[in-house]
């Protein structure tokens, strides 16, 4: 046997078909960042927060109550956060990239947790004031109780859309 010629020759692997490769991995559950479900949740968060913000701004006396000012501030933050992440999710879907970077996922978890907490607290505070004005003081004829209730309900729905995003992203981070 000649030592300069190996007895085993390399075998060329068959080329992979890149056009039919699976786009979503098994661990990509809908609702996680970079999925169509995640984009839908982000757009839902954004829409509900915009509606709550718009309804609250349509009243002329929301600024006299601290809880309503807090609701406006929380929904503005929720709008900005949800829109930014919806753009990132949409881009990830367009270029078929996975958002699995630990730093990115950590940022998403912290941001979702903060905005979810702020939105929920603002909705609860606004609900308390709305009940106080409507049921206890019985001054709905002098105030915009219907608008306050609708804005509060939209804030709760926005929080309801943030919660799955937060839980799924937290699960993604914790499962690393």
Curated annotation (Swiss-Prot):
The keyword Endoplasmic reticulum does not apply. One of its GO terms (cellular component) is plasma membrane. Keywords: Cell membrane, Membrane, Transmembrane, Transmembrane helix. It is found in: Cell membrane. It comes from the Eukaryota. Residues 1-35, 89-102, 174-176 are cytoplasmic. Pfam families: CASP_dom. It is a multi-pass membrane protein. The chain crosses the membrane at residues 36-56, 68-88, 103-123, 153-173. Residues 57-67, 124-152 are extracellular. Homodimer and heterodimers. Belongs to the Casparian strip membrane proteins (CASP) family. This is CASP-like protein 5A1. The lineage of its organism: Eukaryota, Viridiplantae, Streptophyta, Embryophyta, Tracheophyta.
